[in-house]
Amino acid sequence: MPKLVLLSSATLDEQLSRATPALIRWILLRSASHVYRDLVETEAFLRAQGDWVSTVFIKPGGLSLDVQRGHALSLTEEKSPLSYADLAAAMIEAATDPDGRWDMRNVGVISVNGPAKSPPGAPMCIFMGFVRHYFPFLHPYLPSTGPG
């Protein structure tokens, strides 16, 4: 059976994001509302296709441009921030698991040797996303933000 590995978000999973304060989660869900809506629809579609394609739903928390520190996969938690290198290694591990333990499951990723550095641009990125959610007409006038 074919297998997909979908990069999603722990923010969408009650279990994986239970350590995130409710207010922070509420802000995050609005700051990237269009992305999260797309992910919810994509996940629902892929879960409905489970009879012919298997999917692993990788759900990290916050991501950072940092060095690889080591990772672990989890069905119950995530630890943020996580480096992109650790995320990539986790996705490969989940995809190549010979027993299919992660198939059709929400999978968190833990940085096992301490968290990655907090991305310095994250607060501005979240704030700009929040503004775009409530005032979409301002989009052409707002700065682009992202990893860095």
From Swiss-Prot:
Entry annotated with the keyword Cell inner membrane: no
Associated pathway: Secondary metabolite biosynthesis
Residues in the signal sequence: 1-19
Keyword rRNA-binding part of the UniProt annotation: no
Top enzyme class: oxidoreductase
Domain of life of the organism encoding this protein: Eukaryota
GO terms for MF: monooxygenase activity
The protein's Enzyme Commission number: 1.-.-.-
Keywords, alphabetical: Monooxygenase, Oxidoreductase, Signal
Gene3D superfamilies: NAD(P)-binding Rossmann-like Domain (3.40.50.720)
Family named by the database record: Belongs to the avfA family.
The protein's role, per its UniProt record: Oxidoreductase; part of the gene cluster that mediates the biosynthesis of geodin, an intermediate in the biosynthesis of other natural products. The pathway begins with the synthesis of atrochrysone thioester by the polyketide synthase (PKS) gedC. The atrochrysone carboxyl ACP thioesterase gedB then breaks the thioester bond and releases the atrochrysone carboxylic acid from gedC. The atrochrysone carboxylic acid is then converted to atrochrysone which is further transformed into emodinanthrone.
Name assigned to this protein: Oxidoreductase gedF
Organism: Aspergillus terreus (strain NIH 2624 / FGSC A1156)
Gene: gedF
